[in-house]
């Protein structure tokens, strides 16, 4: 239970960082949120709670840990960032005080209702508005494709690359 581990480490002031990915069978390093978006939301709920309730915990370093074997790596990163933004925005909607009260009174039904209410909220319009206000692309993948960024990078760098492992 990753969100429980995150919560425990945050409350003890020991969570230094977090690698985001998704998996189907073991450590597949799939696009963040592609298989288990609700789990991603629950992890962010734990992060939000931990950041709000333990000033001793250092602000965790976050990293996307994915392997881009099938998809364009930049498109995969954009999809991962979208999933992260969406899960984080939804986690910010959770009424942490009510959730803590429901947990303390063992009201599992209310806990589920509070979490699922936030999870089912469509935050994509808010994320698009935020991007627009900061001068970013409302639809990053569409812009990336329209601007032919991949082709420009290939033209600039070439098709062949060598990984040395260093």
Which role fits each region the language model picked out?
Residues 1-166:
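Histidine-acidic metal/acid-base catalytic patches
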């Amino acid at each position: 239970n990753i969100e429980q581990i995150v919560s425990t480490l945050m409350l003890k002031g020991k969570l230094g960082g977090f690698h985001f990915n998704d998996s189907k069978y073991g450590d597949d390093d799939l696009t963040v949120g592609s298989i288990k978006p609700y789990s991603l939301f629950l992890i962010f709920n734990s992060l939000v709670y931990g950041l709000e309730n333990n000033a001793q915990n250092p602000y965790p370093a976050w990293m996307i840990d994915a392997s881009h074997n099938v998809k364009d790596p930049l498109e995969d990163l954009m999809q991962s960032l979208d999933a992260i933004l969406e899960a984080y925005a939804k986690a910010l909607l959770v009424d942490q005080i009510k959730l803590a009260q429901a947990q303390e009174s063992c009201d599992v039904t209310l806990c589920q209702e509070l979490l699922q209410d936030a999870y089912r909220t469509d935050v994509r319009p808010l994320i698009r508005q935020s991007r627009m206000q900061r001068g970013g692309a409302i639809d990053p993948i569409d812009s990336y494709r329209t601007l032919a960024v991949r082709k420009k990078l290939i033209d600039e760098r070439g098709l062949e690359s060598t990984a040395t492992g260093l």
